[in-house]
Amino acid sequence: DVFNNPANYPNYIMISAHRGYWKDYPENSLPAIQAAIDLGADMIEFDITKSDDDVLYLLHDYGLDRLTTGHGIVRKGEGATFEYYKSWDELKNLKLKEVTGEASEYKLATLREALSMCKNKVLVSIDKAENVIPQMYYLVKSLGMVEQVTFKTKIQFFPTPESIKQLVKNTEDQRQLVKMFTPTVYSELMDKDPDLISKMKAFIDAGCEGFEMIYFQDSDPMLTRQVTIEGQTYTNILNWLKAKNTRVIQFPMWPETEKGCWVPRKFKYSIINLKGTDRRCDWDWLLKTSHAPDLIISDRLEILFDYLQTIGKRTL
């Protein structure tokens, strides 16, 4: 109920563990997931991909080198179109790397293993599933976890409820899949997509329960631009979502970094060039924006827990 009805819990901000608790264990590993559960995370977020023989497993990168003792790429593509490489037999005995880069004792986890670990304990958010949604969904359904699992991807990839519904066959599965979907919306779309609000409204009307809203600074149109929807004017798009009792999700980076621009282990994401303009890591700023997020995705759970408890935002 906390996830589905954020308006009923104004003093409780949910915490999602980004790739588990990878401060002490390899990211997207089973022990990282268990550690996050033990710390009290409300949700675990992890990334999935698949082998060329259709085994779904946890891995963020396109290649093996940064995170495992293996080498080479495992997927290639863009948007919701990918090619996959390496069989599960080639992958299952690789060792995951610690944050230091050294090999650990842990192996890649299958999605089935990760979901089974989370079942009846914690909510789940699955990232990078856009090319494997039907397979992911039917596995979640077979485990009896459709009310416990969400998945997310950019709204550009699936801009309408119908684009999600067409991935599965029967009406009930279609309804449930839309309910599980968390569209990710970047602030720049406020200018680039004139139909953005109508698309978001269509998802809400179809049962979608939350959006990951990516805004970086005070001047972002998500914070500054009034919106008028069905004759009602709102301060900004976030306040409209709040009025609709729809969850707002944000992902700030580590709080001790400069303007959110710290990059772990010198691994550079070439598609991101923030240039000191990202204020999401400043939690004081984030929670004082016109509508503070109802759920924060974090790499540093222990710090965020303490912070939210101190300001009275972990009270049910």
Predicted segments — roles?
Residues 1-316:
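Phosphate-group recognition and catalysis centered on beta-loop-alpha active-site segments
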